[in-house]
Amino acid sequence: MTLTVMPKYDAYKDSGVEWLGEIPVDWNIKPGLVAFSENKRSNKGMKQDVVLSLSYGKIIIKPADKLVGLVPESFETYQIVAPDDIIIRCTDLQNDQTSLRTGLANDHGIITSAYLNLKVKGLYSARYLHYYLHALDTTKVIYRFGSGLRQNLSYLDFKRLPVFDISWETQAAIANFLDTKTAQIDEAIAIKEQQIALLNERKQILIQQAVTQGLDPTVPMKDS
C-alpha cells in the first residue's frame, strides 16, 4: 500500500494556540460555539428504540445479546441520536486516558444520557469536525480541558474550543482525503492481522510437532 503525501499549503502562520502550532496562513480561528450546539433530545415516550453504543471510537448499534437484563422503560432516560451527531464520553478523564472518547453517528437511535451529544451548526462538516475532535482525543489534547475531581468535560469546554473558520469545501476535501486514506490503512491492517494469525498458527503447529515427534518428522512413531 502506498500512501499519497498529504498536500501542503504554501505558507503557514502561528495559530496563537500553543497546542495547535502553525496553521495555513488563510485559516482563522473561532470559538467552538459557532460550530457546535448541545443536543438534548429526550427519549421520553420511547420515540426511538434502537440502542446505540460508543465502541472503539465508533457509534454502533448495540447487539441484542448486550441488551439482556435491561429494562425497556430505562430507555426513556436515554437521549435521541441522529446521523452526523458527534458523541463524546466526557467522564473520568483523570483515570481513563486510553479509551477513545469520540464517535460520529451514522444511524438514528438512542444512547445513554451520560454522553454529550454535539450537533454541528452552520456551514460546518460533521465528518471534518469529528476528525478534528478525534485528533484532539488521540493526541491527548482533550485531557487539558475538563473540570471537577475527575476532570469531566462539558458542553462549555466545547463552546470555548478553538475551531477553524474555513470553507465547507475545504472541510469536505480534508474529510474525503482522510476517509480514503484511513480506509486504505484499515485494509492494510486487516491483511497484516490475517498474516499474523497464519504465522501464529504455523508457530503452534511447529511447536506441537517438535515436542511430540522430535526434530525428524520421518522417524517412525510408536503408540504412546
Which sequence ranges carry the predicted segments?
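Short amphipathic coiled-coil heptad-repeat segments
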Residues: 1-23, 183-224
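Amphipathic alpha-helical segments
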Residues: 24-32, 129, 159-200
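Positions in alpha-helical segments
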Residues: 15-18, 113-116, 156-160, 183
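Sequence-specific dsDNA recognition surfaces
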Residues: 15-16, 30-49, 53-86
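Non-catalytic DNA-recognition/assembly elements of restriction-modification systems
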Residues: 11-43, 160, 168, 172, ...
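A short beta-sheet element
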Residues: 79, 83-138, 144, 154
